[in-house]
Amino acid sequence: MPAEPIWPFDNSYARLPERFFARVRPTPVAQPGLVRLNEPLAEALGLEVAALRGKAGLAMFAGNRLPEGAEPIALAYAGHQFGQWVPQLGDGRAVLLGEVVDRDGRRRDIQLKGSGITPFSRGGDGRAPIGPVVREYLASEAMHALGIPTTRSLAAVTTGEPVLRERVEPGGILTRVAHSHVRVGTFEYFHWREDVDALRTLADYVIARHYPELADDARPHLALLKAVIDRTAELVAHWISVGFIHGVMNTDNTSLVGETLDYGPFGFLDAYHPRTCYSAIDIENRYAFDQQPRIAHWNLTRLAETLLPLLHEDEDEAVARAGEALNGFLPRFEACHHARLRAKLGLAESRRGDIDLAHELLDLMARQQADFTQVFRALSDERMDDPDEGPARRCFARPEALDGWRARWIQRLRQEGRPEPARQAAMRAVNPKFILRNHLAQWAVDAATERGDFGPMDRLLQVLTRPYDPQPEAEALAAPPRPEQQVYQTFCGT
C-alpha cells in the first residue's frame, strides 16, 4: 500500500504579514478522480510518485485532505485588466498550499486551481470546469518542452461535481507549480493602498527569494526593476519566436520572475498575421500577437510606478531612475527577438540586413497566409544545392512567391560556410514541428468535457513534450487545421 505522500514544505510567503493573503482551506469535492499525474515533475520536486498515485495523493490533489506542512492561503493582488484598474482581485478560485524546495534547491509554489471559494471569489463559485484544466495542463507542459519559462502542471483531477458556466460542465482541479505567484498586480495592490511598508517588504521578499544576487546592490530595488524588465523582455521574445499569443496580458497575469503565467484564452498562430488575436474577450485586439511587446512595456511601467517610493525619496529622481530602467526594455527585447529570428533562419553570425531578410519572409507569409510553424520547420529541411523544389515552397499558396526570397537567404547562408547538416540541426532545435494548435487543444477539451475521454489529452502530451523531434507517426498532429477545424476564438472558460 502506498505510503502517505511527504511534501517538503517550507512556506515563506505564509510568513509574510497577514495582509498579503487570506488563510483559507480548499473545499472538499464529492468524487475525485485522477486524470493525469506529471511523474517527471513530481520526481524533480522530490515527491514519491507511488504515494501520489494512492488514495491519499488523490485526496490532496482534490483538496479533500491537506498534506502535512501545508499552510493554505489565497494571495491578495489587484491589477489592470484590459487597461482598466481593478483595485482588488486576488486568488478567487485557487489556494496556495505552500512551497517545496525541489531537488535542485529551487523553491516552488504548489497551488490548487479550482479548489473552491476564497475571500477573493467576488461572487464566483471558486471552481473550474475540466476543459480549462485540460487546456492549461497541455499548454504549460507544451511551453516547457519548447524551452519557454512557464508555470507547470503537476496533476489534473475530476471532482465528480458539475460546474455551471454557459452550460453545465464536469468540474476539475489543476495542481499548478510555479517559481512564484507574485505578479505586477501584487505590487499594485499595496501601491493603491499607499502601503509603502508592504511594498518594501514585498520587494525585499522577491529579491531574497528570486534575485538573491541583487541583495548587496547599492540600489537593490532599482536593480530588481531592471531584472524584471530583462526577464520579461526575454520571455515575450521567446513567445514571439514560436507564435504564442497569451491572450490576457493583464498586470495580474504578469509574473515578477519572467514566467508564463495563466493560460486562459491563449493561442498559437496558424497562418501568420501579426495582428492575430484569438481571445473572445479582447474586443479591441489589445493583446494581439504583435502588440505583446508594447503591452509588456506598459505592464512594466505600472510596476515601476509602484516602486517609486523605494527608488528615491525625491519623486523626480525616482521617476528619472524608473524611466531610465524602462528605456532598457525595447533594446533588450529587440536583442533577444533578433537573435531568435537569426537562429530560426539558421544564421550563426550577426550581419547587416539579417533582420530585413527575416521581415521580408514574414511579410510574404502574411500575404500568402502561410503557416508560421510549418514555414520555419520546412526551412530547416531546405538544402542549399536544391535549385528550386525545396519543402518550404509547398507551404505557400503560390510556391513561386518564395523563390526570390529563398535565393537571397541561401546566398546569406553561403556567406557563413557552415556545414549544411550542422545548420539544419541547429534550425530544427529552434523551429518546432509540433505546437499546441488551437484545434488540437479544442479536440482534447471536447473529448474530456463531453465524453470523459482523456485519450486525446494523453496523445497530445506524448507528442508535445518532444516538439522538436520528427515523430513521423504523429504527422497529422503537425498539420495546420482544415477549414472546418479552424478555431477563430478562444475563451477563458473558467
Swiss-Prot record:
Cofactor annotation: Mg(2+); Mn(2+)
Protein name (record): Protein nucleotidyltransferase YdiU
Catalytic activity field: L-seryl-[protein] + ATP = 3-O-(5'-adenylyl)-L-seryl-[protein] + diphosphate; L-threonyl-[protein] + ATP = 3-O-(5'-adenylyl)-L-threonyl-[protein] + diphosphate; L-tyrosyl-[protein] + ATP = O-(5'-adenylyl)-L-tyrosyl-[protein] + diphosphate; L-histidyl-[protein] + UTP = N(tele)-(5'-uridylyl)-L-histidyl-[protein] + diphosphate
Keyword Transport among UniProt keywords: no
Domain of life: Bacteria
MF GO annotations: AMPylase activity; ATP binding; magnesium ion binding
Record: active site: 252 (proton acceptor)
The organism of origin for this protein: Alkalilimnicola ehrlichii (strain ATCC BAA-1101 / DSM 17681 / MLHE-1)
HAMAP family: YdiU_SelO
Alphabetized UniProt keyword annotations: ATP-binding, Magnesium, Manganese, Metal-binding, Nucleotide-binding, Nucleotidyltransferase, Transferase
Residue sites binding Mg(2+) per the record: 253, 262
Annotated residues for binding of ATP: 90, 92-93, 113, 125-126, 176, 183, 262
Assigned protein family: Belongs to the SELO family.
Root EC class: transferase
EC number(s) stated in the UniProt entry for this protein: 2.7.7.-, 2.7.7.108
Signal found in the keyword field: no
Job description of the protein: Nucleotidyltransferase involved in the post-translational modification of proteins. It can catalyze the addition of adenosine monophosphate (AMP) or uridine monophosphate (UMP) to a protein, resulting in modifications known as AMPylation and UMPylation.
